[in-house]
């Protein structure tokens, strides 16, 4: 493999080399003394001495974590929630329009769908500790939300120098940088929260509209589309193949080999070692990395890829629940919602949360924008 394959110095392992007959450990010390100002050491003795020192310390007892009491779930109910998909039309009946198309540059459009006002139970006791306790949250006003994540093309209309670059490829002997993530229709990635907010600011100035990132409450309300399940389309075990782009059986295609590496055959002796990425192996969504367009089904509000494809910045601080619109506590992190093509369902639910520094450019995080009236 043209690379060291041992985790230690193995003297005289290759008998055909010119230094055969020399004690390579002693020779190494001699040369280090000669060319590094007497820095040669008997490293085998050093290691043996340290091992003896550790042995004399006796048994090392681990420090066990404190026992955590079971979380008591508090069941909250909201009148009229959850609701069936066919109720969305009724909720938007008083709206003059439910779809808005903006031309943000010559020939470049961005489509928004109307998200109704409403109330729901935010968070879940079935997720990580940062997803509870749950709380009732009211979305007071309807708002517009991008039906898709902001694309490379849309982002480049304001920041033309940005390049989302590539998704890393395994193996070696590459002839390309990786899997493209910079196609015009793909969602933009490797943009920070600060970058996303600056994009919103400039786009607002150009259009005269109040364009920004959603709060995490707005995001979760929009993502759920009336559902109180883990996903808008069901629970953690639901088949997401036609619904969203998550870590599925297609992830096995990251296991590649050869010059200009191509997917390994399942018959390859290396296959079981290189298909190590965690995944929902019983689902096939047909996508290896993030995709553009409307390949998957929209949720009841008309939004695509809220659970996967790429995760999305919100404008909320990453603080403990219960959720508050204007928390007294502030955080140095901003909340990212949703999962991505490389994440399993349990990390991609409607209530999953992550926190990143506002200056971080993350390989699988993009954003979608909203318009507030």
Question: Where is each model-derived feature located?
Answer:
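Eukaryotic protein-protein interaction scaffolds centered on beta-propeller repeats
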Residues: 1-66, 99
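N-terminal pre-domain segments of enzymes
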Residues: 62-102
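Short, P/G- and charge-enriched loop/turn segments at secondary-structure junctions
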Residues: 98-103, 130-134, 277-279, 353-358
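A short glycine-rich, aromatic-capped structural motif
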Residues: 101-168, 191-194, 308, 373
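Residues embedded in well-ordered beta-strands
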Residues: 113, 144, 230, 312, ...
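Functional-site microenvironments in short loops/helix caps that host divalent-cation chemistry
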Residues: 121, 126, 179-182, 193-354, ...
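Second-shell loop/turn segments in exported
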Residues: 144, 182-187
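Short, structured beta-strand segments at or near domain termini in extracellular proteins/domains
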Residues: 363-373
